[in-house]
């Protein structure tokens, strides 16, 4: 009999198929980050027409273009996903509060990345179907959510972790607005204080932070109520695809 302290629902992805799923999530995020880094920094390509003015000028050095790249919320989100997946792989059975907060933060931030892009930015994007764009704004968000739903870690998320998910977005906001005040450049038009009134920017930021808290709470509740059998069934389907075992067969985990 498995004791509650060692129940599979509360543990990290120890089984091979779960680890492969988490590893795929990690590689997806890393691929997206490496692709856009090479494209934006080392190729030195001119910015697309829909780029905010002042970002990625051809005369900038690689270090300056790297700073431009990390002004994007999207890049912070994908970086956090990669970090969270790496920590889950290295410490699958941990109950570290810091790692659980990072995992929840990555889920929330990458979800917001996808939602904001596809509802507010995609319509005017000039590189909608590019490899880097789809990797960052579609594949990484979808794979990250599927990984959590199917492979876990399950039972990690709690409502008391919610205050912690605002730390990284707050750091991004401080970096973005301090840098914008100094250089006069911003990553997104809707927070560009050169063209948008402060009150509108504050309202938008407050709304996004509110959505972040709601998403975080929703993920905590889903993690609490999602039946273990549903995850186990999903796991058997994944194993049937990846290991070619019959879906109905129960394998030892």
Q: Language-model features: where?
A:
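Membrane-interface transmembrane-helix boundary segments in multi-pass integral membrane proteins
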Residues: 13-19, 68-71, 183-219, 248-249, ...
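Alpha-helical transmembrane segments of multi-pass membrane proteins
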Residues: 27-50
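Perimembrane loop-to-helix junctions flanking transmembrane segments
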Residues: 47-66
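Membrane-interface loop-to-helix entry segments
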Residues: 73-75, 129-142, 205-206
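Interfacial segments of alpha-helical transmembrane regions
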Residues: 95-109, 158-166
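Non-cytosolic membrane-interface motifs at loop->transmembrane helix junctions
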Residues: 99-102, 125-137, 160-161, 191-195
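Juxtamembrane "helix-exit" motif on the non-cytosolic side of transmembrane helices
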Residues: 117-126
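Alpha-helical transmembrane segments in multipass membrane proteins, preferentially the mid-helix core
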Residues: 141-157
